[in-house]
Amino acid sequence: MSDKQQQKHKQKARQARVKAQINRDKARRNLLRQREKLARRRTRNRKQSEPRRDDSDGDDTDGETVKNPAAHSTMPPQKSNAENAVRNSHSTVPKTPKYSDVTARERLYGQRLHQKTAGGNSEASAPSDESASGSPTEDEVNDE
């Protein structure tokens, strides 16, 4: 390969890495946004179902107590995302990707994920997140 071809190859490889980082960050923002929507939907559903549950008080339509043991959950009821964040507070994913020269983003799970989504909307925190990680912007990709 000539020097010109090598330079072109290196430039394309660099652009591919930058594009992959941008796509990763977009997917991450979308996941955080989806998580916020899911939390809002859960609270809305919980508000709708609690009055119905209080009205039934474990009785079926005939006034008899339901005796189905499969209908009882052994898991504690989910009251908030904070409770779930504490329950799922470990990760088996390595901190840095194997065989990769791309800088890894901070893993979001457990309390960090809850704080990230509860601390405000994901769009407001996303620009500061990207500048801290050193991930290039779309304009930087187009300049290369």
From Swiss-Prot:
The UniProt regions of compositional bias labelled Low complexity, in chain numbering, are: 122-136
Give disulfide pairs as residue numbers. none
- Region Disordered, as annotated, extends over 1-144
Q: Does the keyword Nucleotide-binding apply?
A: no
Write out the GO cellular component annotations. Answer: gas vesicle
Location in or out of the cell: Gas vesicle
Which effects follow disruption of this gene? Answer: A single deletion produces no gas vesicles, in situ. Deletion of gvpG1-gvpH1-gvpI1 prevents gas vesicle formation, cells still express gvpA1. A single deletion makes gas vesicles as long as the cell that sometime distort its shape. Complemention restores wild-type gas vesicles, in H.volcanii.
What turns on expression?
Part of a gvpF1-gvpG1-gvpH1-gvpI1-gvpJ1-gvpK1-gvpL1-gvpM1 operon, maximally expressed in early to mid log phase. Gas vesicles appear earlier when grown in static culture, possibly due to O(2)-limitation.
Q: Where is the composition biased (Basic residues)?
A: 7-17, 26-46
* Chain intervals with Polar residues compositional bias: 75-94
State the source organism's domain of life. Archaea
**Keywords assigned by UniProt?**
Gas vesicle, Plasmid
Q: Does the keyword Nucleotide-binding apply?
A: no
Q: Which family does it belong to?
A: Belongs to the gas vesicle GvpI family.
Q: How does it assemble?
A: GvpF to GvpM interact with each other in vitro, and may form multi-subunit complex(es). Interacts with GvpC1 and GvpO.
Other remarks in the entry = Encoded in a 14-gene plasmid locus called p-vac which produces predominantly short, spindle-shaped gas vesicles during all stages of growth.
Tell me, in a sentence or two, what this protein's role is.
Proteins GvpF to GvpM might be involved in nucleating gas vesicle formation. A minor component of the gas vesicle. Gas vesicles are hollow, gas filled proteinaceous nanostructures found in several microbial planktonic microorganisms. They allow positioning of halobacteria at the optimal depth for growth in the poorly aerated, shallow brine pools of their habitat.
Q: What is this protein called?
A: Gas vesicle protein I1
What organism does the UniProt record list as the source?
Halobacterium salinarum (strain ATCC 700922 / JCM 11081 / NRC-1)
